[in-house]
Amino acid sequence: MTQKNGPLRVGIGGPVGSGKTTLTEKLCKAMRDKYSVAIITNDIYTQEDALILARRQALSEDRIIGVETGGCPHTAIREDASINLQAVVEMTRRFPDLDVVFIESGGDNLAATFSPDLADLTLYVISVCQGEEIPRKGGPGITRSDFLVINKSDLAPYVHVDLEVMEADAMRMRAKRPFGFTDLHRGKGVQEIIDFIVENGGLEPRSN
């Protein structure tokens, strides 16, 4: 069903290579049969992530808009989100029944956050390959995101990372905010994230 105040806007942030685009792909493929879904991607100089998602057939091409931000990627999702807000308006014009828009940030550091004017819910993706210490380094992405995704958990033995240490640090840094370990390549942990989005975003499956 269409949201009364427009589509639910879900921001997906995280460093380069953490798995943001793969998460966006998995969420769209899992949710597109129950909800009207669209994607807005952010890249500094290209529309590479939008093209990747189109090639992977996450959604039809008309449901994907690639935004070229220029400069620092966090500016387009926080200080001046107008380019992304315009893309949301355009996507809503194309699909008046839109339920949810995933807004994928360009790769950025742990200080990146979404403006509350742009995102209703935020997911922040980190990878175990970036180091066991990442959760305890903090930063708004780690501490304030609505759901922290700790991706590539399957690679922990190969990069000498103790997942129990990461779990304890994430729990301490995030207080009671939820987080989860994922292996997005194999789809592990995706359903937990979907359940979080549906419950906290007030989504209801559209009737046939």
From Swiss-Prot:
- Carries keyword GTP-binding? yes
Q: Pfam families annotated for this entry?
A: cobW
Binding-site positions, GTP = G14, P15, V16, G17, S18, G19, K20, T21
Q: List GO terms (cellular component aspect).
A: cytoplasm
Top-rank taxon of the source lineage equals Bacteria
Nucleotide-binding as a keyword of this entry, yes or no, is: yes
Show the InterPro entries listed in the entry: CobW/HypB/UreG_nucleotide-bd, P-loop_NTPase, UreG
Which one GO biological process term can you cite for this protein?
Answer: urea catabolic process
Keyword annotations: Chaperone, Cytoplasm, GTP-binding, Nickel insertion, Nucleotide-binding
Primary location: cytoplasm
Which Gene Ontology molecular function entries are recorded, alphabetically?
A: GTP binding; GTPase activity; nickel cation binding
Cellular compartment(s): Cytoplasm
Subunit structure and binding partners? Homodimer. UreD, UreF and UreG form a complex that acts as a GTP-hydrolysis-dependent molecular chaperone, activating the urease apoprotein by helping to assemble the nickel containing metallocenter of UreC. The UreE protein probably delivers the nickel.
Q: What exactly does this protein do?
A: Facilitates the functional incorporation of the urease nickel metallocenter. This process requires GTP hydrolysis, probably effectuated by UreG.
Tell me its family. Answer: Belongs to the SIMIBI class G3E GTPase family. UreG subfamily.
HAMAP family membership: UreG
Q: What is this protein called?
A: Urease accessory protein UreG 1
Protein species of origin: Brucella ovis (strain ATCC 25840 / 63/290 / NCTC 10512)
